[in-house]
Amino acid sequence: HRELHSFPTRRSSDLRFRGTREDILRCVRGARERGLTLRTSIIVGFPGETEDQFRELLDFVEETEFDRLGAFTYSPEEGTPAAKMPDQVPEKVKEDRFSRLMLLQQKICLRRNKARIGSVEQVLVTATEGDGFCLGRSSREAPETDGEIYIHCGKTTPEPGLFIPIRISEAGPYDLKGEML
């Protein structure tokens, strides 16, 4: 998990960020080659963030295709260096940028989840829903922050805490549906 904010290709000394866009993309490529799930958090509206920098961030998010992305708008904390920085971004601009980022990420999540349709995955059963359904999570979904997998179990509903194989059958931007094998 890596927290980001909009950044040009130079290093950002404002947040003591160690790395450039190219450094992050190299890490992303390595993680993808190993089949890892990529997640990050993004601060929108950090002081001094320009529209051009924000568009560069959107391009970066589109190129990177994080599996999971959380975002929040910057809010000044008393006593921090950023709270005293010039060029504070207006709330309305921060909210607009946040909405644009989340809309983009929703499309990315849907695209990445659709790519999982037909795959067989091991999931941890987290709850039973009755009528032959249960909820679960694979190694790609973090508890309390990511979507869930709704599983049709048939006549045998496994108990929470068991790992079961499923085939992903449907995908939404955040949640998946599957069939127990």
Language model: regions and residue ranges:
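Short, small-residue-biased leader/transition segments that mark boundaries at the very start
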Residues: 1, 5-12
